[in-house]
Swiss-Prot record:
Protein's name according to its UniProt entry: UPF0253 protein PC1_0961
Family: Belongs to the UPF0253 family.
Pfam families in alphabetical order: UPF0253
UniProt cross-references to InterPro entries, sorted A to Z: UPF0253
Entries under NCBIfam families matching the protein: PRK04964.1
Amino acid sequence: MQEYCELVRRLYAEIASGDLGYIPDSLGCVLKTLDGIAANDALPSSVREQAAFAAANLLVSDYVNE
């Protein structure tokens, strides 16, 4: 858990404690979030590219593993 930033660790603790809602479709949540980042023209292109690359890799790994 230490490899993740403070914000991720804090939200993890809140979800684990029940203070924040848990989303059962975590892969769908991640893909929707990465897609939103990749589509956001207000963000730097490098950030958008990273999000798109991560989303595409998730889609490939999910498809290949089925």
